[in-house]
Curated annotation (Swiss-Prot):
GO terms for biological process: translation. This is Large ribosomal subunit protein bL36. SUPFAM superfamilies: Ribosomal protein L36. Belongs to the bacterial ribosomal protein bL36 family. PANTHER family: 50S RIBOSOMAL PROTEIN L36, CHLOROPLASTIC, LARGE RIBOSOMAL SUBUNIT PROTEIN BL36C. GO terms for molecular function: structural constituent of ribosome. Coiled coil: none annotated. The keyword DNA-binding does not apply. Keywords: Ribonucleoprotein, Ribosomal protein. It comes from Francisella tularensis subsp. mediasiatica (strain FSC147). GO terms for cellular component: cytoplasm; ribonucleoprotein complex; ribosome.
Length: 37
């Protein structure tokens, strides 16, 4: 899980979702998981 100021899609499998006001990226590749913080 990467914590970043700006979350971006890193590949075509990445999805940007909002979970209780936290922006997250979920992906098939676990190295691409991110959250904004």
């Amino acid at each position: 899980m990467k914590v970043r100021a700006s979350v971006k899609k890193m590949c075509r499998n990445c999805k940007v979702i909002k979970r209780n006001r936290v922006v997250r990226v979920i992906c098939a590749d676990p190295r691409h998981k991110q959250r904004q913080g």
